[in-house]
Amino acid sequence: MRQIMLFEQGISPTPIVKMSGGYGENQYYIKREDMIPFSFGGNKARKAAEFYKEIRACGVDVVMTYGSNSSNHCRIIANMVASMGIACHIISPEENRERLYNTRLVEDFGATVETCPVTEVSGTIDRRMEAFRQAGRNPYFIMGGGHGNPGTRACVNTYREIAAYEEQAGISFDYIFHASGTGTTQAGLVSGKLLADAEKREKGKPADGLKIVGVSIARNEERGREVVRQSIEDYLGARYAELYRDEELIFTDEYCMGGYGKYTPEVAQTIEEVMKSDGIPMDTTYVGKAFYGMRRYAAAHGLRGRNILFIHTGGTPLYFDFLERQNL
């Protein structure tokens, strides 16, 4: 099993920069997780680095995961596993078979893609894992989107990077916004804040007033909040009852636009605006949709003069899918 030196050395903090465009009556900053130097970057690369450690430790010879044809997670896991020199098997819903850039990359990395109806995903995963074991293989399964404690831990580190930037730059963010899909990113950010606030209280300092807002790209609020809360509980373990504050979990489904992958002309306009003003590519499924939702949320809640950080969670290949659709 080959090493990936970036993951062996550890991922360096990603840059935070003030945005140039006029996006409303607040000061907007962006954390460029898309600049992590592996497979087009993104928070999925940060999560993959955590799964990499477990895979190396367990002597795995095949990695399984789940995701759609547009999945950034599947692209990065397929790339990571190819770099390690072991097999990758992806379960994907047959309902989404348009050949996107992420689809092509997954194929180029040599992953086997097995499709099934979305209603049969769970059973297909179980059967395939058992088939690998019966064949004498040592499979390792990663939940869709990098869901689970390794992924949450990766995003706790994201929060710590943000806190370190605030201290170094002499700035305090009032809000953090990001795209919320499987919920792991938000679980990590909120867990990081809860742990940091507990340390401050122990030192007699006030907790941070920062609000973390997950902009749902698919799930309704009830389901989305519960998945994030459960991930926080799983990660904090015995400290959950002591640390968790329900008001810290802000999840909005007001900008889902009908579900996963759905978007409006206003989202497309936002993506074009950000590219022209700041030179930053976004996409219609995750980041561009969430950035648009952030601006609408800020206007609806009367936010003015605030320091707002948006986390660019990656997905550059999807930007080129967007360009192709715009040129049809």
Region roles according to the model:
Residues M1-L328:
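PLP-dependent amino-acid enzyme catalytic core
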